[in-house]
Structures are given as C-alpha cells and as structure tokens.
Design a protein with these regions (language model features):
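N-terminal active-site wall of soluble small-molecule enzyme domains
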Residues: 44, 48-97
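Short catalytic helix/loop segments, enriched in acidic residues and glycine
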Residues: 24-43
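Conserved anion-binding
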Residues: 15-27, 92, 99-172
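Conserved, mostly hydrophobic/aromatic
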Residues: 12, 42, 50, 94, ...
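C-terminal helical cap(s) of enzyme catalytic domains, especially alpha/beta-barrels
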Residues: 114-121, 210-243
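Structural preference for beta-strand elements that scaffold enzyme active sites
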Residues: 6-10, 49, 76-80, 100-103, ...
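Charged helix-capping and loop-helix junction motifs
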Residues: 62-69, 112, 142-151, 176-185
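Catalytic cores of alpha/beta
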Residues: 75, 79-101, 181-216, 236
C-alpha cells in the first residue's frame, strides 16, 4: 500500500499573535509573530492544509476570530478551525467563514446530544479532538480531565464520527517525539481516520507516523518544530509523501 501522509502546519493564536504553548500551559508561551504572515509562509512553502487554533476562545478568555477570518479569506489552503466551538452559533460561524473542517473538543465530551446532532448532519466537516493526558480526555483548554479516551471513542463512533485528532498533551510543544503507542492504540479501537498531533521534532518522526498510515493515521499536525527551524514544511511534505 502506498503510504502518503498529509502534513498540516499549525498556527495557534493568543492575544493576536502566533504562539506555541508547552503542554497546553498558558504560562509557557513562545511568540512567533504575525499569524497571517505565518499562514502566507506555509502557503508559499507548499502546504495544502492549515490548522488554526484560537487559544483564547479555547480557554474561554477572549477571541481572535477576526484574525482567523483573515487567514481563511486570504490563504489559498484548506483550513481547519479550532478553539471554542461549543454551540450552534460558534459552529455556524466557523462553517460560514469558509473553513473546510471544524475541530470540536470540549463540547464533544460534555454535550453528547449536541455532538450527536452535529455528526448526523455534518460528520464529513467535523474533527473531534481527543486531547489525552494519562489515558483520559482533557477539556476546557486541557484544564479538566474527564473520561477514558476509549470510552469517548466508543460513544462517538456510534454517533458517526469520521475523524479524530489525537494529541498527547504531555508531548505537545515539547519537541520530544510523538507518542506512537498512543496513536496505534487509538487506531486499534476505531475505524475512523486519525490525525496525529503533538511532539513531532524531526523528519524521522514524520517518517515514523507515515508508517502508521495503513492503521488509519491520515495526517499529522506540526507546530513548534517548524517554528524552531528543525525542518521546513517542504522537507516534511517530501518525507510524508515518500513511497
């Protein structure tokens, strides 16, 4: 089987700036400049997808929606929008902005009846974020731990979820390598597609995740490694698409 992995650069926005957090902690922030310019850089480098996160909305402390809208409007890439999508109004705003997919985290766990309705209507455009710490789902900007991820997947699979984004919180923003065991474990309990996120530090990490494509891993979100110059997006794409 040909193993082609999609590489998705990430732009996390806080207080109007492109930033990276370490393990989701708001007190460990690195500023990487203008998010719109960062998006243009990824576009020029050949990325076809972009993952955009409004961190302030995710934490419930504000909004960077005007910047998100600017990115969606100006950038000729497919956009995944994430952060603070928890009800009909915020979901509709994300869809009408022109984004191709919307990532839902907290509400998918805390509001089962709502996410079931959304998946019944728009499953192809929805990603459910499984942000995992010690085997359990963390919500509300990763500040509250809830149910085991396997329990969440059983319910969400039954409701028609087609795509999950799996993040090992302990790896996110650390450049210590992805949790391949977790990715394999999640893939083993669902037939839905999985997007890997968190910890990617080297091109070898990209190659390792590419080996999991036959198990259901379809793409990988990369953030800090790109900002810190560990490799370029074009180099990552070349490795990911190597047969």
């Amino acid at each position: 089987m040909e193993q082609i992995l999609t590489v998705i650069p990430a732009i996390d926005i806080k207080d109007g700036r492109a930033v990276r957090l370490r393990q989701g902690r708001r007190d460990q922030v690195t500023d990487y400049g203008d998010p719109v310019e960062r998006a243009h850089e990824f576009e020029r480098a050949g990325a076809t997808w972009l993952h955009v996160v409004d961190l302030d909305a995710a934490f419930g402390v504000g909004s960077n929606w005007k910047i998100v809208e600017s990115i969606v409007r100006e950038i000729d890439m497919k956009i995944e929008v994430s952060g603070g999508v928890r009800d009909d109004a915020s979901l509709e705003r994300a869809f009408t902005s022109g984004s191709h997919r919307v990532t839902i985290g907290t509400a998918a766990i805390e509001n089962p009846s709502w996410i079931a309705k959304i998946l019944n209507r728009d499953a192809g455009k929805v990603i459910v974020a499984l942000d995992i710490r010690d085997g359990r789902i963390a919500t509300r900007g990763w500040t509250e731990e809830t149910i085991p991820y396997s329990e969440a997947i059983r319910r969400l699979d039954g409701e028609g979820c087609l795509r999950y984004m799996v993040t090992d919180i302990s790896k996110d923003g650390t450049l210590t390598g992805p949790n391949l065991e977790l990715l394999e474990a999640v893939s083993a309990v669902t037939s839905s597609s999985v997007i890997a996120s968190g910890g990617v530090a080297t091109l070898e990490d990209i190659a390792s995740i590419r080996e999991l494509v036959p198990q259901g891993i379809e793409s990988v979100v990369v953030g800090k490694a790109l900002y810190e110059g560990a490799f370029t997006i074009s180099e990552a794409i070349e490795v990911a698409e190597r047969s």
